[in-house]
Amino acid sequence: MNHSLSNKIKLLKISLLSAAIFSIVACGSDEQSLKTVTDESTLSSSNSTTATGSSSTEQVLCEYSYNEYNDSTSVQTTSSTDWACTGTTRYVVANGIPDHDVGTFPNPDNPNTISEQTVSESFTLTPIQSDTTTLMGGPRGVLGIVLNGVKIDAGTGGSCDDSVDNCSLGDNSGNWSIEALSQDTFSFGTDDNNAHVQPDGSYHYHGMPEGFVTLRGGNSSTMTLIAWAADGFPIYARYGYSTADDASSPLKEMTSSYQHISTVSDNRPSIEIYPLGTFVQDWEYVAGSGDLDECNGRFGVTPEFPQGIYHYYATDTYPFFQRCVKGEL
């Protein structure tokens, strides 16, 4: 890289990151793209249902609740969440305050302060997997809620146009949607929980909620259910059985099936300034390249569902949390 280009990159990064202090840090772009394909894989197991069809979650974590003061410096208030199951519906009422340590908010790249929210969501207890996908997040609707009552919103409102000079972390007017976690050109001020704060004070996760996973006892020797998706299917953290329909198989870290695009568009902003992975459009689903489908999920057995159920995973690589759901809404 020549000296002139190197200086341009440094100046561009400084100006963009400084501007972030004054921008509205919005999340959940409605311009995100996802190549949707039908997942035709099935499992053959005598104790499993088919890979498409209905399941029941009515006996699982229906009375999960938490109500404790969080003395983390940037919180200093009570975290409250209550889950309940009635009839065919799972309900959550929470104040959106995390139950674990958080980073410093406001911070130089996220000017917002954590505050209590009104969280009230419902999910079916009998989710039905389909062959189609539905994009979620941001204006499309809540993708899922972690058990502590904090919402999942993996996308951002940041974007760039086709040039190298016009990017915003908040207005979502460009053709290229900026990722929060898979790049280091832009900073959205996320903490060690892969979370930050929206202008309304809403703390939310873009990726693995490390503090909550730790509180749940998550590690390489256990599957850890951490959230419910909008379609009613469960979301697990990081680890799953190496053989999807065999609970006696070793646990392994689940890998997504998203890869960097193989062909770069001529109108994409310079890769020298914005490396592959910076934008949502830099990723494509390659069936069979990982363990999971286009919604970062699969059908298989879990500790809570020994007969098998479709379920999602939070992963350490893109898409981190799924951007779509496979169940009926």
Question: Where on the chain are the PLM-derived regions?
Answer:
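C-terminal motif of bacterial Sec signal peptides marking the signal peptidase cleavage site
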Residues: 23-26
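Solvent-exposed N-terminal domain segments of exported/luminal and surface proteins
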Residues: 32-43, 47-187, 191
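Extracellular/lumenal glycan-associated surfaces
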Residues: 123, 148-150, 199-212, 305-319
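Extended, compositionally biased non-globular segments
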Residues: 231-233, 238, 242-329
